[in-house]
Amino acid sequence: MWRSRWDASVLKAEALALLPCGLGMAFSQSHVMAARRHQHSRLIIEVDEYSSNPTQAFTFYNINQGRFQPPHVQMVDPVPHDAPKPPGYTRFVCVSDTHSRTDPIQMPYGDVLIHAGDFTELGLPSEVKKFNEWLGSLPYEYKIVIAGNHELTFDQEFMADLIKQDFYYFPSVSKLKPENYENVQSLLTNCIYLQDSEVTVRGFRIYGSPWQPWFYGWGFNLPRGQALLEKWNLIPEGVDILITHGPPLGFLDWVPKKMQRVGCVELLNTVQRRVQPRLHVFGHIHEGYGVMADGTTTYVNASVCTVNYQPVNPPIVIDLPTPRNS
């Protein structure tokens, strides 16, 4: 759910307040859009009543609101790898879930690389070093990376619990000494690593977060509902590009084998009702590879590996007009 602290009169009042002196009541589209941005910055996202059942949530919102139906939502063809980049645009190359299988990937031309997590199998330092070497071999001007549930050593609370409980479900990770993993992020010297943090490149504000709904007790897992919402509430308004490891509800989150939607309802409401980024990149659900759009945000599930962990899905290319202030 979401609610707002404003009533219908606020849009008119804020648009009027944003008018230059002497223009009276002549509302331009830019003033109305500015007022709408003010409105969205005041939206408060609450835990959805269907939070614990994303498949039911999808059905409810689709039937009652048409929220996932054309023309509101549609599949989108990614930019061909050999297409020329339009003047004044920045080319983003999006990948996710490479799982230490980067050798077969044919990386296309671009300006900024985005990796949405699961670049290793278990987050072992040796895997991170190998991934960092691969990053260093790539020619992109910027390389932005977040962790996923497979980067176990990047989740310090997970590691503390793992060692404390003497739990050997992940034996190779459990045997690591704290000094081997406490600063594992420092091994990523060839990229910008984001974890509930933001960076601005080429004028684009980019925010990254690794969290996702509980998934068999891996890294960066949180219960659906309030715990995840608190993480999404950290995402600031005005972000141009959002990177999360898991998908929002209804966008490239379908798991055919289980006949279930597995995306996060609170992430969907945060993206659509409050943040409204131009681009949202994620992975995690290997079966969901592809691109969708809702008229405001382009959603990219950039999972390179299939459900059988074969690295056959090509990187997804997205061109965005470069902000004028870059």
From Swiss-Prot:
SUPFAM superfamilies: Metallo-dependent phosphatases. Transmembrane segments: none annotated. CDD domains: MPP_239FB. It comes from the Eukaryota. The keyword Iron-sulfur does not apply. Expressed predominantly in adult brain. Coiled coil: none annotated. Its EC number is 3.1.-.-. Pfam families: Metallophos. May have metallophosphoesterase activity (in vitro). PANTHER family: METALLOPHOSPHOESTERASE, METALLOPHOSPHOESTERASE DOMAIN-CONTAINING PROTEIN 1. This is Metallophosphoesterase domain-containing protein 1. It comes from Homo sapiens (Human). The lineage of its organism: Eukaryota, Metazoa, Chordata, Craniata, Vertebrata.
